[in-house]
């Protein structure tokens, strides 16, 4: 069975690398501009009067490789923006501005125009301003194009959503993804191009081409989630990206997240799993599996969350609940994420 590690990505090694880097960061300012206590969360923030200024930075990873194969660059900028703004809203912050960074080996005016169109589409959907950026020509360092960005967001101090209030009995509402989003592309490319010997124009069994599926842009959840925060007591927010539902542990680490009511898995994931003979556990640790964002609320508020999401044309479902502990093979587990799928219980460690 093929794994993400076989495709060149070791998420556990990445965790260790991040910890090694973070262990060396010891300096903090000693004046009134202090960082918020959000270590390990989706976004970083500093105090600024009655507000927190929030920063997120991210790129599109190897999705750009598929864009180059298909010679289609107008959607990947939307992915870059989505990866940033969707992280920012996880603490209740409203994204307001973006700066982008593009590193190129060589680039044509046509590709630049496509990227510009995608940037405009992404900032429009996110309701943010693009206020600057950098384009670096690095022919001796890079092949093709890499695109990343940093988003600035703001939130009032008394309105931050940290996830610390998540408790047993709360429900987890899952918002539909548009597909693969921007994570797991290395494994997807290995399955489709190396194992199945397909190309970007090959049609999959459900009718779409490989390029159409892999280049569908990441869903931007800014508008519905900000509306939810205004209308409902939202207790936790999670952007489901690399690592899948493991991301829920970024919120309250003292509870269990039990995912046991998943909707139908999207065709792209079924196709990939079949072609690559990928295990269920590997799929759920690598991909969003059709749920791109989670909202945690008290039981009586779940229907309102679903109503708001549907109003924004994003299907939403109660996919699970918060518990103090879960039972797996006769063993009691605490402080974990449990996914039940195909009559199988999988711990997402």
From Swiss-Prot:
Recorded superkingdom: Archaea
GO term, biological process aspect, one: 'de novo' IMP biosynthetic process
Gene Ontology molecular function, alphabetical: ATP binding; phosphoribosylamine-glycine ligase activity; phosphoribosylformylglycinamidine cyclo-ligase activity
Keyword annotations of the record: ATP-binding, Cytoplasm, Ligase, Nucleotide-binding, Purine biosynthesis
Pfam families assigned to the protein according to its UniProt record, in alphabetical order: AIRS (PF00586), AIRS_C (PF02769)
EC code: 6.3.3.1
Any single GO CC term annotated in Swiss-Prot or TrEMBL for this entry: cytosol
Major localization listed first in the record, in broad terms: cytoplasm
Enzyme class, broadest EC rank: ligase
Protein's cellular compartments: Cytoplasm
Recorded metabolic or biological pathway in which this protein acts: Purine metabolism; IMP biosynthesis via de novo pathway; 5-amino-1-(5-phospho-D-ribosyl)imidazole from N(2)-formyl-N(1)-(5-phospho-D-ribosyl)glycinamide: step 2/2
Catalysed reactions listed for this entry: 2-formamido-N(1)-(5-O-phospho-beta-D-ribosyl)acetamidine + ATP = 5-amino-1-(5-phospho-beta-D-ribosyl)imidazole + ADP + phosphate + H(+)
InterPro entries on file: PurM-like_C_dom (IPR010918), PurM-like_C_sf (IPR036676), PurM-like_N (IPR016188), PurM-like_N_sf (IPR036921), PurM_cligase (IPR004733)
Family that this chain belongs to: Belongs to the AIR synthase family.
Name of the protein in its database record: Phosphoribosylformylglycinamidine cyclo-ligase
Source organism of this protein record: Methanococcus maripaludis (strain DSM 14266 / JCM 13030 / NBRC 101832 / S2 / LL)
Organism placement in taxonomy: Archaea, Methanobacteriati, Methanobacteriota, Methanomada group, Methanococci
Gene assigned in the entry: purM
């Amino acid at each position: 069975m093929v794994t993400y590690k076989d495709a060149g990505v070791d998420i556990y090694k990445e965790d260790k690398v991040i910890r090694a880097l973070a262990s060396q960061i010891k300096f903090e300012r000693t004046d009134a501009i202090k960082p918020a206590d959000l270590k390990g969360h989706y976004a970083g923030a500093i105090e600024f009067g009655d507000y927190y200024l929030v920063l997120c930075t991210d790129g599109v990873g190897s999705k750009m490789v598929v864009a180059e194969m298909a010679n289609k660059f107008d959607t990947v900028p939307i992915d870059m923006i989505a990866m940033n703004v969707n992280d920012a809203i996880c603490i209740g912050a409203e994204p307001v501005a973006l700066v982008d960074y593009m590193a190129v080996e060589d680039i044509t005016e046509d590709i630049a125009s496509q990227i510009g169109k995608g940037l405009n589409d992404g900032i429009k959907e996110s309701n943010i301003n693009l206020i600057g950026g950098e384009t670096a020509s690095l022919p001796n360092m890079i092949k093709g194009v890499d695109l990343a960005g940093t988003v600035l967001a703001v939130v009032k101090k008394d309105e931050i959503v940290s996830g610390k209030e998540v408790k047993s009995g709360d429900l987890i509402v899952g918002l539909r993804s548009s597909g693969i989003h921007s994570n797991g592309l290395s494994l997807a490319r290995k399955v489709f191009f190396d194992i199945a010997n397909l190309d970007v124009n090959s049609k999959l069994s459900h009718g779409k081409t490989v390029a159409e599926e892999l280049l569908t842009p990441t869903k931007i959840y800014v508008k519905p989630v900000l509306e939810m925060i205004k209308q409902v007591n939202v207790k936790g927010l999670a952007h489901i990206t690399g690592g899948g539902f493991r991301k829920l542990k970024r919120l309250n680490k003292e509870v269990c997240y039990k995912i046991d009511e998943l909707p139908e898995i999207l065709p792209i994931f079924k196709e990939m799993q079949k072609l690559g003979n990928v295990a269920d556990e590997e799929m759920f640790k690598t991909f969003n599996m059709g749920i791109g964002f989670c909202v945690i609320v008290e039981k009586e508020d779940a229907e309102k969350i679903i109503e708001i999401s549907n109003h924004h044309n994003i299907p939403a479902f109660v996919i699970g609940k918060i518990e103090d502990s879960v039972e797996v093979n006769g063993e009691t587990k605490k402080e974990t994420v449990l996914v039940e799928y195909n009559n199988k219980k999988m711990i997402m460690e």
